């Protein structure tokens, strides 16, 4: 509990200072581009919320080390492992000059470091032929780095509205913490709760008023952390199905895969370029703006931005709740994954055609 509170208040207070003194750093830290296809804010806002989250993790880790608390070593190792992903992400936030490929490579390096020091490798996914391939160390290492980097990028993709990516990460981490508690894996429980505290400190300033954004540094850090913890939970506990890891991250994973398919196959475009057809973008444009109007004052527009996120929180819960209920039943989890995909596609098509179901209003 002490680590949770320390993480929360460190994040909360450090981000308060970032916001309070933004006039000193806004020339570098503020997101002033209001015209891009994925830009839905109406004023210049600092996008270095990830700095507060990282500081919270680092301070909590150092405090745990000084007090010789349990799992302080693992916490500090995970924080240090996250450095390449976080530093490249926040450098992009400050300079706008770090390409997506470099950020992905940095996150893959972070995954490799975490895998080496914490033995966080993907060795099974519950499919016989693939599990045999993953028994080969080089394949396991490569797949782990790819998966963690992909999930971190997925969190960056869904980070489009106030509170969206941060709350989905909190929900996913609480699911991980619950299953860790069920299997008595206190290390995973501790690492998940510490990150929940750090994100919660950021969330208070981000939602609903959007006083600060997560930024690439924050999104990659959170995605990396969630990815490594799901891998550790499965690899350390044979009772936990690998499909729990898939379902608990189903929304960001499928949003990314669906985006790649939509751009490459359906539209014939470069999948790496930003566009305005993400599910969260469509909900905002075709539901929120239609319901509340678009000719609003900046403060009202910021609140409208925030009204988008709860829809996606509910959608992500469609996969996370079954993951929590049936975390050791792989076939049920596979079926739930298919059901989630079907629901996602049906809802996406409905919103595109302005025919949203009544329960989605």
Predicted regions mapped to residue ranges:
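Membrane-interface starts of transmembrane alpha-helices
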Residues: 99-102, 136, 215, 300-311, ...
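Cytosolic, membrane-interface loops and tails of multi-pass inner-membrane proteins
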Residues: 20-46, 258-302
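Glycine-rich, flexible loop segments associated with nucleotide phosphate handling
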Residues: 44, 75-76, 138, 244-245, ...
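"…together with the soluble PPM/PP2C metallo-phosphatase catalytic core" -> "…together
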Residues: 1-257
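Alpha-helical transmembrane segments and their immediate juxtamembrane interface regions
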Residues: 81-99, 322-361
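Hydrophobic membrane-spanning alpha-helices of multi-pass integral membrane proteins
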Residues: 57, 198, 303-323
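Extended hydrophobic-aromatic, low-complexity segments
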Residues: 238-243, 260, 272-273, 294, ...
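Membrane-helix cytosolic exit motif
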Residues: 18, 254-266, 270, 327, ...
């Amino acid at each position: 509990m002490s680590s949770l509170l320390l993480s929360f208040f460190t994040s909360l207070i450090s981000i308060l200072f970032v916001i309070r003194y933004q006039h000193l750093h806004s020339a570098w830290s503020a997101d002033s581009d209001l015209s891009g296809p994925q830009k839905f804010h109406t004023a210049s806002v600092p996008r270095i919320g990830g700095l507060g989250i990282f500081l919270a993790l680092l301070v909590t880790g150092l405090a745990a080390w000084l007090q010789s608390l349990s799992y302080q070593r693992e916490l500090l190792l995970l924080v240090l492992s996250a450095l390449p992903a976080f530093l490249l992400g926040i450098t992009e936030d400050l300079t706008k000059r770090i390409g997506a490929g470099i950020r992905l490579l940095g996150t893959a390096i972070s995954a490799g470091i975490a895998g080496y020091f914490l033995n966080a490798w993907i060795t099974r996914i519950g499919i016989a032929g693939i599990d045999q391939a993953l028994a080969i160390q080089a394949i396991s290492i490569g797949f782990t780095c790819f998966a963690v980097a992909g999930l971190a990028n997925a969190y960056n993709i869904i980070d489009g509205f106030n509170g969206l990516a941060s709350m989905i990460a909190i929900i996913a981490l609480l699911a991980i913490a619950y299953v860790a508690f069920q299997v008595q894996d206190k290390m995973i429980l501790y690492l998940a709760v510490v990150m929940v505290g750090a994100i919660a400190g950021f969330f208070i300033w981000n939602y609903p008023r959007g006083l600060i954004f997560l930024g690439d540094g924050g999104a990659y850090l959170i995605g990396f952390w969630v990815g490594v913890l799901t891998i550790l939970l499965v690899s350390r506990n044979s009772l936990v199905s690998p499909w729990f890891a898939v379902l608990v991250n189903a929304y960001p994973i499928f949003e990314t895969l669906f985006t790649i398919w939509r751009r490459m196959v359906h539209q014939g475009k470069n999948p790496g370029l930003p566009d305005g057809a993400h599910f969260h973008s469509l909900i905002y444009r075709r539901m929120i703006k239609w319901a509340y109007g678009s000719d609003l004052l900046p403060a009202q527009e910021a609140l409208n931005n925030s009204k988008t996120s709860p829809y996606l929180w509910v959608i992500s819960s469609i996969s996370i709740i079954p993951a929590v209920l049936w975390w050791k039943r792989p076939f049920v989890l596979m079926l739930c994954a298919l059901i989630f995909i079907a629901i996602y596609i049906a809802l996406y098509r409905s919103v595109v055609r302005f025919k949203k179901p009544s329960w989605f209003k």
